């Protein structure tokens, strides 16, 4: 809801963060922050992706207030794990949300019930594929609910430890073509 998003944005603003808001699948970030994204993200390919796909705005807070409607997602990149963890602790008090993160120093906030796992199950319903026949692969914290939700959850060898523990299987790493090897062995053979 709009009120929850306003609270979360306020929390993120208290920390040194790169903030993004999403409406209808489009991400908005501050022009100024986009020019110094490397302060928050030391993965050049990901930084390039973000700077090339986000709509630059003068101020994220102003854009949020102008839109004046519920958003898809709020994301923040932090400069320290301590700040990320402190912000997460504050945000956990906000009702009706899901907290995740694909990167070591980020938090992604969605409405409760909005996650990759639910999306895959809904797509399966549309396509006539039962949950038991849906397989998903993941490596990060943002994949945890997905691997638990689907019929077969597979973690990559390079996945975070908690994801490996939750998965039904662990395959080779991304660099070793783990997804392809797993499908060849367990699906195609």
Locate the predicted segments by residue.
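Glycine/small-residue-rich loop that forms an oxyanion/phosphate-binding "nest" at active or ligand-binding sites
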Residues: 1-3
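Conserved acidic, metal-coordinating active-site core of Asp-based
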Residues: 5-7, 11, 15-18, 22-137, ...
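Mg2+-dependent phosphoryl-transfer enzymes with acidic/Ser/Thr/Gly-rich catalytic loops
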Residues: 92, 107-189
